[in-house]
Amino acid sequence: FEKVKPINEAMWARAAEITGVPGIAEEYYGYYKDASAFGACSYHSRYALYEGCKTGSKDGQPVAPLMGNMKGFDGGAGDFQMGPLTFMLNYPDHCVLYRFIPRSITETDMELVWYVNGDAREGVDYDKEKVAWLWHHTSLEDEYIITRNSEGVNSQFFEPGPYHPEYESTLMEFISWYLSTIAGLKA
């Protein structure tokens, strides 16, 4: 985290002016046990992209017109959480919403929805394959990892290990909230 701190701080300093969105770099954490009410998880943070990247695309260059009140590209992306199982990654020109839908103890569906400016016309202002490229590939890679992890966890040889307190703290919070929830305890 220290390695990217100066890059993030530089992006945060310019974000509101370049994007035209006051407070865009302000963080908010209110999820799982810290949510204002059951299921009312909400979270926002903004972080810098790689040098020279304006958006989340194959080459880091814009794939659609700016959305909403955005005035420019600040080299950042916003992470949002809405409820315990719905997340959104927002770039100035597009965003992807992903929702996890548990179906059973071993099955979960993941729904992905991409958004662009409401006035943008497919094939004219954006190419949906270019908009979806990064998170389509990321989701395929995630599915591969998750499937292999599930096979391992369901193996008779599986022995759980500890979570990393720095890199997996959010996962640890989710598990604590989830176990309390299914046990009928107040989260």
Regions found by a protein language model. Give the residues of each.
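C-terminal catalytic domain of Rieske-type non-heme iron oxygenases
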Residues: 1-187
